[in-house]
């Protein structure tokens, strides 16, 4: 059923690339979009009405007000179907219009008496860089008795790369970029064990990375040691020229439950990279990263190289 769509998309991309080379010095952003649309209409890739369509952005104030109202019903659970949560369009409206949305979100946050709705608005405001809901987010993280539901990396499409409710509040807290979040985030980190789901590690490391500070280095190093997070790498023997017998580790895959080897590596590397980015402590972060540059899992090796060479795993535009 998707074949016609893919064919049309492929033709459109090819046409755009050709126009860029012929008429825009290779810059696709500079091509004449109307001319491209006319060609695609001529070839029945697009309907004729497209030539009369106008840009919908920026949206009207009324649309933004309605979107903010709709977000009262935003849920925090994992859903893939709109019948469970149809607020995602409203969220897109708000996120794409931050300047207009923030005053409305702040008003809605202040006026609501429902804790779950207040948390909704606090999360959105934090992601938009506004600290109005900081107290609510900190309290939500502190009051969560544990981490709740979480998932390891696995071969399951629905849950392999997602976050649980507490994970999502922790990530939102990280967006505040304030020293006030260090203590609650470290407290949440210390609740984790080696067997804790990977999604919890990803959430707290992402949140702390957005608030990285030298004061976090020693607690992170202690966490690595006390939680037995170190030593899960599989260094390939051919890197050691003095070693006569060369081992050839088999890269471990994942199953429906995940697989401990790959997930344990993931956890160790995330915390070590965060430690390194916070200034390191007794070179512990660097030592782990250097070992992983020779790991059998190439994606971990590449990640370790990236952090060591750039001092961070986040681009200059991302954090």
Predicted regions span which residues?
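Alpha-helix capping and helix-loop boundary segments enriched in small/acidic/polar residues
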Residues: 1-5, 27, 112, 160
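Active-site-proximal substrate-binding core of FAD-dependent oxidoreductases
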Residues: 18-52
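Structural detector for internal amphipathic alpha-helices that build alpha-solenoid repeat scaffolds
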Residues: 81-97, 107-110, 116-131, 139, ...
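A conserved FAD-binding loop/helix module that cradles the flavin
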Residues: 1-17
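C-terminal/domain-terminus segments
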Residues: 289-308
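Charged, amphipathic alpha-helical linkers/stalks
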Residues: 40, 47-87
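Short inter-helical turns and helix N-cap capping residues of alpha-solenoid HEAT/ARM repeat scaffolds
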Residues: 113-114, 145, 162, 193-197, ...
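Amphipathic alpha-helical scaffolding segments comprising HEAT/armadillo-like alpha-solenoid repeats
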Residues: 61-78, 98-111, 130-155, 178-192, ...
């Amino acid at each position: 059923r998707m074949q016609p769509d893919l064919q049309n998309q492929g033709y459109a991309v090819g046409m755009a690339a050709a126009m860029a080379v012929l008429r825009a010095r290779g810059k696709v952003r500079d091509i004449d979009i109307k001319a491209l649309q006319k060609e695609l209409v001529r070839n029945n890739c697009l309907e004729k009405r497209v030539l009369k369509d106008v840009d919908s952005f920026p949206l009207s104030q009324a649309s933004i007000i309605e979107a903010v109202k709709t977000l009262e019903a935003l849920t925090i659970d994992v859903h893939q179907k709109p019948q469970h949560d149809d607020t995602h369009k409203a969220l897109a409206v708000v996120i794409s219009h931050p300047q207009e949305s923030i005053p409305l979100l702040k008003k809605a946050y202040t006026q609501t008496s429902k804790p779950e709705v207040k948390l909704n608005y606090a999360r959105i405001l934090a992601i938009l860089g506004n600290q109005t809901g900081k107290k609510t987010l900190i309290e939500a993280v502190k009051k969560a008795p544990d981490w709740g539901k979480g998932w390891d990396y696995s071969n399951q499409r629905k849950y392999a790369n997602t976050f649980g409710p507490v994970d999502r509040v922790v990530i939102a807290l990280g967006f505040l970029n304030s020293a006030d979040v260090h203590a609650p985030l470290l407290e949440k980190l210390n609740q984790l064990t080696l067997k804790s789901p990977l999604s919890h590690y990803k959430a707290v490391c992402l949140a702390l990375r957005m608030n990285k500070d030298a004061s976090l280095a020693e607690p992170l190093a202690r966490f690595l040691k006390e939680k037995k997070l170190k030593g899960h790498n599989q260094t390939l023997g051919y890197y050691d020229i003095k070693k006569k017998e060369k081992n050839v580790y088999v890269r471990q895959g994942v199953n429906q439950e995940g697989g401990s080897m790959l997930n344990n590596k993931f956890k160790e590397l995330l915390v070590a990279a965060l430690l390194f980015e916070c200034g390191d402590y007794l070179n512990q972060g660097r030592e782990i990263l250097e070992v992983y540059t020779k790991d059998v899992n190439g994606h971990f090796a590449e990640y370790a190289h990236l952090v060591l060479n750039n001092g961070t795993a986040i681009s200059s535009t991302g954090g």
